């Protein structure tokens, strides 16, 4: 039995797209470890407002980040419909709370457009670019930019 393996062309990259509110974002799929359903987190004292707390992921403590709040959007009110994207950020693994995962995209660097100058400083800080695919506008998030070196070490 043979399995078809899709290989990427030189310059292609795979991204995982997800929704937060009415907006669509994406991250490099190579950073994503797994996608799991929402699990209530245990709050941690003196943590940033965007950190919901921690969960037990197969014996490991996983910090859960409200990605909406971290991006300067209205904080999420997690429900069973939300999902956690477990991702590698620098040398740490974190959980990113999003509304839903929508797609896996294969794109070339040429379709990634620069973030407009009129965007907020916060948006430009985290956004690597914008993808216009069909009638969708998808913001490419740079996960490493979400956390300073010290925050990443603390996570």
Curated annotation (Swiss-Prot):
<dbReference type="GO" id="GO:0007165">
    <property type="term" value="P:signal transduction"/>
</dbReference>
<feature type="domain" description="CheW-like">
    <location>
        <begin position="12"/>
        <end position="152"/>
    </location>
</feature>
<dbReference type="InterPro" id="IPR002545">
    <property type="entry name" value="CheW-lke_dom"/>
</dbReference>
<comment type="function">
    <text>May be involved in the transmission of sensory signals.</text>
</comment>
<dbReference type="InterPro" id="IPR039315">
    <property type="entry name" value="CheW"/>
</dbReference>
<dbReference type="InterPro" id="IPR036061">
    <property type="entry name" value="CheW-like_dom_sf"/>
</dbReference>
<protein>
    <recommendedName>
        <fullName>Probable chemotaxis protein CheW</fullName>
    </recommendedName>
</protein>
<keyword id="KW-0145">Chemotaxis</keyword>
<dbReference type="GO" id="GO:0005829">
    <property type="term" value="C:cytosol"/>
</dbReference>
<dbReference type="Pfam" id="PF01584">
    <property type="entry name" value="CheW"/>
</dbReference>
<keyword id="KW-0963">Cytoplasm</keyword>
<dbReference type="GO" id="GO:0006935">
    <property type="term" value="P:chemotaxis"/>
</dbReference>
């Amino acid at each position: 039995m043979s399995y078809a393996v899709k290989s990427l062309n030189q310059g292609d990259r795979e991204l995982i797209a997800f929704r937060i509110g009415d907006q669509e974002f994406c991250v490099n799929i190579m950073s994503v470890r797994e996608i799991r359903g929402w699990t209530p987190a245990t709050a941690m004292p003196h943590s940033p407002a965007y950190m919901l707390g921690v969960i037990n992921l197969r014996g490991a403590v996983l910090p859960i980040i409200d990605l909406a709040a971290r991006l300067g959007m209205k904080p999420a009110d997690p429900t069973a419909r939300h999902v956690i994207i477990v991702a590698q950020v620098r040398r740490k693994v974190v959980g990113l709370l999003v509304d839903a995962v929508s797609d896996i995209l294969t794109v070339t660097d040429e379709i990634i457009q620069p973030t407009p100058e009129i965007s907020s400083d916060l948006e430009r800080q985290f956004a690597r670019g914008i993808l216009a695919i069909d009638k969708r506008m998808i913001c490419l998030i740079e996960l490493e930019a979400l956390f300073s070196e010290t925050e990443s070490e603390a996570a």
